[in-house]
Amino acid sequence: MVDDSTRKTLSNIPLLQIRAGPREKDVWVQRLKEEYQALIKYVENNKQSGSDWFRLESNKEGTKWFGKCWYMHNLLKYEFEVEFDIPVTYPTTAPEIALPELDGKTAKMYRGGKICLTDHFKPLWARNVPKFGIAHAMALGLAPWLAVEIPDLIEKGIITYKEK
């Protein structure tokens, strides 16, 4: 189910230990520390391999995340706002990643611009609770979704390149 490239990417993202969500206030701080460490490592790895593709930050509580992601297609950079909330049942429930500006532009998306991850990602996440975190959701959820959907949306003329 997972190709060699994805397997290599995954093996370089630290696995998380602490099983805590936003409701467990004291332990959640420790889980957030693990989340940030894994995200930092993932971004560093991406930069070293020349595949840097997102920036994220969170609110003070670590329950709302937002930032930008981008996809390179034919040497043009397509940039999108990305956002998600950490579910109260996290890490049992994976975050639902949204690209609001693409809402309604593809069938592989739910209302509000939430990307469809049910078939491939959610079963994998469920088998790896609490080891997977936000970095894993980006690597196994958003990255493959962008790789499949963005070129298709570009070819259909649904999204176009915007000069900056």
Curated annotation (Swiss-Prot):
One GO CC term on file: cytoplasm
Domain of life: Eukaryota
GO biological processes: protein K69-linked ufmylation
Keywords from the named record: Ubl conjugation pathway
Keyword Cell inner membrane on entry: no
Calcium recorded as keyword: no
Catalytic residues of the enzyme: 116
A single MF term (Gene Ontology): UFM1 conjugating enzyme activity
Matching SUPFAM superfamilies: UBC-like
Pfam families linked: UFC1
Family: Belongs to the ubiquitin-conjugating enzyme family. UFC1 subfamily.
Role summary: E2-like enzyme which forms an intermediate with UFM1 via a thioester linkage.
Protein name, entry field: Ubiquitin-fold modifier-conjugating enzyme 1
Source organism of this protein record: Drosophila sechellia (Fruit fly)
